[in-house]
Amino acid sequence: MPDVTVYSTTWCPYCDRAKRLLDQRGIPFTSVNLDDDPRFRSALVELTGRSTVPQILIGSEPIGGFSELRALDQSGKLAELLAA
């Protein structure tokens, strides 16, 4: 299973929803809190081209935010990505 990384902040409700969805599916992930260090946001922009949160990566592939994660989950494509 590829690594899943969630870039988030403490004040973002969509970040909480994304992490909750991953938890409910039993998908392990690493959470990177952008509040901890401003350099993390620069790294996020470099990796994804976006500065909004949450941003979710599966392996080194950015998939977007909570809406994209939910759509992948509902379509069954999230399981496919994680099985690769």
Range-by-range predicted roles:
Residues T10, V32, L44, F66:
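Conserved short-loop catalytic and cofactor-binding motifs
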Residues Y7-P13, D35, S51, L69:
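Residue-level signal for short amphipathic helical patches enriched in basic/charged
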Residues T48-L57, S67:
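Structural micro-motif
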Residues M1-P28:
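Local sequence-structure signature of Cys/Sec-based thiol-disulfide redox active-site neighborhoods
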Residues P13, R39, G64:
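Short alpha-helical
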Residues N33-S51, K77, L81-A84:
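Thioredoxin-like thiol-disulfide oxidoreductase module
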Residues I58-A84:
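Non-catalytic, surface beta->alpha helical segment in thiol-disulfide oxidoreductase systems
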